[in-house]
A protein has these predicted regions:
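An often Trp-containing, charged/polar helix-loop segment at the C-terminal end
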Residues: 85-109
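Low-complexity, serine/threonine/proline-enriched polar segments
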Residues: 217-262
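Secreted peptidase-domain scaffold signal
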Residues: 116-212
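Short, small-residue alpha-helix embedded
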Residues: 70-84
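Catalytic-core environment of secreted peptidases
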Residues: 1-72
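Noncatalytic modules at the cell exterior or secretory-pathway interfaces
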Residues: 183, 260-286
Length: 304
């Protein structure tokens, strides 16, 4: 076999050569492996492929691999999440698939995050975590919609940001003291692409609007946190410690499903229980708002 167990399949597509493009794929699923043959060089093999039912009634089973297999497994997981929690929107289902994903040890050996993400995305979804997240972790799912822009003095400017004060046990976290904990945040939303514009020269001309999230740091006050992301509040700013994030802001925001996590002490996390979701650039901002929807639905998933 060409690829080691847990590593990226030789048949996988990636965005590694794009470098500054979107994070694709967002997740990876089993797609089989390729064997080496001295005559045919590389070839698929039943022992290195998945098995599925055959469309030929004379045969009961056939080998299954590559994108067809991975897509089928991803669809299966999405269906199981929706069945387990029917009230979830498909935005949340999509978000949970990414939120539950982890890198295998082989993927981590690739090296830097900037190389792992365009090759493997956020990793392999953990089905048990995706289906039973409330039983394994403290998990919050917020489904909402945001109006990103409004017209002021003849031009469009930013409108809403959403503030979430997480209902978590602050006293319990403080009592845990120096014990290490992990908080993961995933934001899932859809955009409307600009008609006839590929967006190669300006990534903000392709999506209708972009959304972003941020978490209050332990070293800043609530006022400083809100002012840092509210450009209408003047020049008062504080620097957000970007080193605390695993993926980092610039990398995670290359897509419409963004996930990142922080590992810190429980005492530090106790004072970081506030999240904001806010709008960024998009082609709606350059159009007459009366002619566009100007509403973005999103799902925000938080787990500790």
């Amino acid at each position: 076999a060409l690829a080691a167990p847990g590593n990226l399949s030789p048949m996988s597509r990636s965005s590694w050569s794009w470098r500054n493009g979107c994070n694709k794929p967002e997740i990876v699923m089993e797609g089989g492996n390729i064997a080496y043959h001295p005559v045919f060089q590389t070839t698929t093999h039943p022992d290195l492929s998945l098995i599925t039912t055959c469309q030929d009634l004379a045969e009961s089973l056939e080998q299954f691999h590559a994108t067809s297999a991975a897509t089928a497994l991803a669809t299966r997981l999405a269906a199981k999440i929706k069945t387990a929690t029917p009230t979830l929107s498909m935005l949340s289902v999509r978000g949970m698939m990414v939120h539950s994903a982890k890198w295998t040890p082989e993927m981590i050996r690739i090296g830097n995050i900037k190389d792992i993400i365009p090759l493997c995305g956020y990793g392999v979804p953990d089905e048990e975590t995706a289906l039973f997240s409330n039983e394994k972790y403290a998990t919050f799912i917020f489904e909402n919609e945001l109006i990103p822009y409004w017209e002021k003095d003849g031009s469009n400017t930013y409108n809403q940001l959403h503030f979430y004060d997480l209902p978590w046990p602050t006293e319990v976290l403080e009592q845990m003291g120096e014990e290490n904990v992990k908080i993961r945040i995933t934001l899932s939303y859809y955009v409307k692409p600009s008609p006839g514009y590929a967006g190669r020269s300006n990534k903000y001309r392709y999506p209708s609007a972009t959304l972003h999230f941020d978490l209050k740091s332990a070293s800043e006050s609530m006022e400083e946190f809100l002012c840092r992301r509210n450009k209408s509040e003047g020049e008062k700013r504080t620097d957000n410690d970007t080193n605390r994030w695993t993926i980092k802001q610039q990398r995670r925001e290359q897509g419409t499903v963004q996930s990142d996590w922080i590992e810190c002490t429980a005492a530090e996390l106790a004072s970081c229980g506030q999240i904001i979701v806010y709008p960024g650039q998009g082609w709606w901002k350059e159009r007459k708002l009366a002619n566009v929807d100007n509403v973005i639905k999103y799902s925000l998933i938080v787990s500790i």
